[in-house]
Every structure is written in structure tokens, then in C-alpha cells.
């Protein structure tokens, strides 16, 4: 009797795992990533995370060298206008079945001014390019 119960439990667990694996594999076929620099990454990250279909938004740094890619190094006064400074960016991971790249880019252009060089509003420095 114990063996049969154990077998039935295993059978159901296997069925659930298989269904979950199938759904997860199907959903991940539509996972895409884009890196966007739209000024200070803290506010940008929060804005992207609020969009339905965005799975994750993660702050980071891109396109620099000669400066340590960490917050303290990047915001130092000596790096404020350093052309080699890293830019603050957000890595946006999204499900393209739930939100289009066009919608993400629409949000991108609505929330920052691409005509401002090395600044976004009151934030000034090459990290905001």
C-alpha cells in the first residue's frame, strides 16, 4: 500500500513538473532584453518596472573605461565631465507577448530628453549622456 501511494504521489508530481516546465519553456521564448540610458538610473528603473510585461529592470553601467564602474567612482567631481566615464543604464527584461519593444521605447522617449548632452534635468555629468 505504501508503495502504491508513493507511486501515485510521484506520478502527480511528475505531471505537475512537466506541465510547469512546458509552460516556462514556452514563455521564455518571448523574453527579450534591452539596455537603455535615460538619465539617473534609480528613477528610470522604477519607471520601467511599473510597465506591465516588464519582468525585471536592473540598474548598471555601460560604455566606459578607465573608471571603476561603481557609483562612488562615477559620481566623483573629477569624472563629472570625463568622456571615458560610464553611463548609467537600465537593463530591461520583458515578455514581448505582454509588452512590445515599441511601447518600451515610447516610455523611454516620454521620460527623458535625448537632446540634452550629459544631463537629464538637474542631473549633470557624463554618466547621464
Where are these regions (language model features)?
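Flexible coil/turn and secondary-structure edge motifs
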Residues: 3-7, 24-129
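Bacterial N-terminal signal peptides
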Residues: 10-21
